[in-house]
């Protein structure tokens, strides 16, 4: 005798497989850490870790894959630079585009695509290490690949010698840094001197702002302005890095600096700028008159005397 057979209706959905992941999908930074142990172990010290910690970013802007792209293919292939966004294999433009995907909001980087560095194919990874800052690089949050001065000297080697001169700004001693005066990401400031190329100075009206933020007593405005300061800036008389001359002057004796303008040879078009240059009225062969600033003591500008005597 046959028993009663019951047929149970079982939903077919419980046997259905999950849809396959696209081959190159986001796998999460934990998966990266299975192979890249040292990098992953120290990643929490990296400012880029904030993209994970915030919990607010989309996968394409989070952790390792925020910079290197989705890691699905890379993991399936067992590694290899061809299956991931490897910065060492990217063009300068690709590197810049990747970094600016997140780092485009700061005004100090607003002109980076037209900066002298970018035009020379010097981009982010030439100075920065995305996985962590060098031990002697300060501050760590900037992820510098080396100590800042050493990074700059890598290309600007002649500047290293200037900072070893008897009179200099104390960069080698760590008192100030190159970026206290220069913006390596580009600037909208005009260049030092007429017709000169961009030196990436921090933004200012006439390029003297980098100097005046330390030398505040020279800022003015003054009732009687020194025309060379107003028109050409500090480097009309001074060199910025280092010199064998006192006060970083361009020439060893003060009067030879002054005679570059006050020589009686004309105004060289400066009248168009509202500047009339007086020729020197003393005998410059007389040693008594060769230290102009002994009398013209307010040479950067005065509020009481048009000849800067007080």
State the predicted function of each range.
Residues 1-13:
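Bacterial N-terminal signal peptides
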Residues 13-310:
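Short sequence/structural segments immediately N-terminal
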